[in-house]
């Protein structure tokens, strides 16, 4: 698919399209000598779709290969194309990023990011998970 780089006088930003994992991330990271922030696809994955969508561990490896100072997971929690729950990509990637010491920002839908933000650990999506699970419990009791 397609990815692009925005290179300003003081910052470099990487934005990925849908992609399978490969050495191209390391090549790009080396070519641009790393990125201040990398927006990397993180969702709608399945082992059968390895050429077009990365698994969470591959997304984190791509952030490492790109030499990203900060990683922003994108393409998650949207359209249900895969078999995983809507929140699985962010939960998995957040956990792996924390284990590997990769700064991760997961902005709320519509939230504006500024270049001062380095590591935002607001786990806002968990309230939605809890609400969804409680709704399912209530529905099961009512039926």
Language model regions located:
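Cap/insert and terminal regions of metallo-dependent hydrolase folds
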Residues: 12, 20-109
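Core dinuclear metal-dependent hydrolase active-site scaffold
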Residues: 1-33, 109-143
């Amino acid at each position: 698919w397609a990815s692009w780089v925005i290179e300003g006088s003081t910052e470099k930003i990487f934005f990925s399209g849908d992609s399978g994992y490969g050495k191209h991330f390391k090549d790009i990271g080396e070519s641009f000598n790393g990125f201040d922030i990398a927006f990397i696809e993180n969702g709608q994955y399945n082992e059968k779709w390895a050429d077009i969508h990365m698994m969470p561990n591959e997304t984190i490896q791509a952030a490492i290969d790109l030499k990203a100072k900060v990683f922003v997971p994108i393409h998650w929690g949207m359209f249900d194309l895969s078999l995983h729950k809507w929140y699985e990509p962010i939960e998995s990637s957040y956990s792996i990023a924390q284990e590997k010491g990769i700064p991760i920002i997961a902005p709320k839908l519509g939230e504006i990011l500024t270049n001062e933000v380095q590591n935002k650990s607001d786990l806002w999506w968990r309230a939605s998970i809890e609400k969804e699970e409680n709704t399912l419990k209530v529905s099961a009791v009512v039926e």
